[in-house]
Amino acid sequence: MLLAIDVGNTNIVLGIFAGHELKCHWRVASDRQKTADEYGLILRQLAHYQGLDLKEIQGVVLASVVPTLTQVLTEMITKQLGHQPLVIGPGVKTGMPIRFENPREVGADRIVNGVAVYELYGGPAIVVDFGTATTFDAISEKGEYLGGAIAPGIGIATDALFARAAKLPRVELVRPPRLIGKNTVACMQAGIMYGFIGQVEGIITRMQAEMGGKAIVVATGGLAGLIGPEVNCIDRVDPMLTLEGLRIVYERNT
């Protein structure tokens, strides 16, 4: 079995693959204060509840945008599983040409998403990853990573509105029943949700035009299930796209 780990600023997503099949996955908070031993305990508890034997894990692949957690999790994997993880970064074979001014600047998760979307859906394609930040990544018809855009995530926008407007309460991030709100909370939810949707649709539409025509648009990330269905120009919602990309890259390096 293969353990795939996607380390983000807010959450860590772990998945267990048996061949090409994703057997199970978990989402835990990204906590920079936790030690390797604490993360090891979490992994063992999750595996126990799932009825999995960690001794069956034959390889580990990891993509991270949090350097401190990369070190902690690498130590945890070495101690708990006896494996050296494949950490996505320079020198790792992805099979995807990077048409970026400085390829080392591209986040590991964005590269992995690009690999996955081209392998699973073909190109040209656009990946929208709804996480702490919202990233848009363009993949050519030939499978080249072309670049993209980075915008604040909807959670950041919500926190900023609450923090900077003294009389506005903190609200739950949910789809409002209508655009025209009838109370302060509903008005905030409508403005946050539909303002964000408009931003996403605008960036996708302009990106497609810059790419010369129609590109398949795939949404992923922790908030893809909430926001993806509301965006008219998103074709597919695939919350496990990053884990699939990690599996694909691992296979290309073994």
Curated annotation (Swiss-Prot):
Keyword Repeat found: no
Residues binding K(+): D129
Assembly mode: Homodimer.
Protein name: Type III pantothenate kinase
InterPro entries: ATPase_NBD (IPR043129), Type_III_PanK (IPR004619)
Binding residue positions for ATP: D6, V7, G8, N9, T10, N11, I12, V13, T132
Pathway in which this enzyme or protein is active: Cofactor biosynthesis; coenzyme A biosynthesis; CoA from (R)-pantothenate: step 1/5
Top-level EC class as recorded in UniProt: transferase
One Gene Ontology molecular-function label: metal ion binding
Required cofactor names: NH4(+); K(+)
PANTHER family, sorted: TYPE III PANTOTHENATE KINASE
Cofactor note: A monovalent cation. Ammonium or potassium.
The EC number(s) this enzyme carries: 2.7.1.33
Catalytic reaction annotation: (R)-pantothenate + ATP = (R)-4'-phosphopantothenate + ADP + H(+)
Binding site for substrate: F100, G107, A108, D109, R110, T184
CC per GO annotation: cytoplasm
Subcellular location(s) per record: Cytoplasm
NCBIfam families: baf, PRK13318.1-6, PRK13321.1
HAMAP family: Pantothen_kinase_3
Family: Belongs to the type III pantothenate kinase family.
Function: Catalyzes the phosphorylation of pantothenate (Pan), the first step in CoA biosynthesis.
GO biological process entries: coenzyme A biosynthetic process
Record-annotated active site: D109
